[in-house]
């Protein structure tokens, strides 16, 4: 009902589900990472899971159904999963990015063309992965996917000058 109420007031609504870590220390979701190498593809498939598993896929599809039923304007299929999107398989590919592309297609099938879809990269993730002397723009295939409508970047700029003193 809230989405419909906000829309009735002339506002646009984007659903932005967050993954919070429910373990001691409550680490940032961007620290969840796979292990580079031969097992990375299977590992990312397990993290995303199926539509009825308790993985990222089930969560995103749940919110896609809400977006479709309630008339949301947009849906972020994930956010700040830097550790996952940087994980590389044995061939140097990025299996979590492949999973997000598949997930975008699955969400598109639920919400249709009228709901804008994207993945919100962390400010330290969006510009690529820098390692072993190379820069790889790992998210480009996701953002260029026909099921993704725009580039989204989470950025938390300071609202005030936090330094002490005048000036």
Predicted feature descriptions by range:
Residues 59-63, 131-141:
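Alpha-helical scaffolding within the catalytic cores
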Residues 127-129, 159-160:
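A short beta-to-alpha transition loop/helix N-cap that caps and shapes the active-site region
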Residues 29-35, 86-95, 129-135, 165:
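Short, flexible/disordered intra-domain loops and linkers
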Residues 55-62, 95, 99-102, 106:
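Extracytoplasmic/secreted proteins, especially bacterial periplasmic and envelope-associated proteins
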Residues 1-89, 110-119, 123-124:
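Substrate-binding cleft and catalytic face of glycoside hydrolase catalytic domains
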Residues 98, 102-118, 141, 145-167:
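Glycoside hydrolase catalytic-domain groove-lining segments
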Residues 3, 41, 128, 133-136, ...:
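Intrinsically disordered, low-complexity regions
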């Amino acid at each position: 009902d809230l989405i419909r109420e906000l829309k009735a007031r002339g506002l646009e609504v984007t659903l932005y589900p967050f993954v919070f870590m429910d373990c001691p220390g409550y680490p940032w979701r961007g620290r969840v990472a796979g292990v580079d190498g031969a097992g990375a593809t299977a590992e990312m498939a397990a993290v995303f899971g199926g539509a009825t598993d308790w993985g990222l896929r089930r969560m995103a599809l749940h919110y896609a159904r809400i977006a479709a039923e309630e008339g949301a304007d947009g849906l972020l299929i994930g956010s700040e999963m830097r550790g996952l999107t940087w994980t590389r398989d044995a061939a140097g590919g990025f299996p979590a990015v492949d999973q997000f592309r598949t997930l975008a297609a699955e969400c598109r099938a639920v919400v249709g063309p009228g709901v804008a879809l994207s993945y919100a990269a962390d400010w330290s993730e969006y510009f690529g992965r820098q390692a072993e002397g190379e820069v790889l723009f790992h998210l480009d295939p996701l953002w260029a996917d026909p099921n993704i409508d725009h580039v989204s970047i989470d950025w938390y700029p300071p609202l005030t000058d936090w330094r002490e003193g005048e000036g």
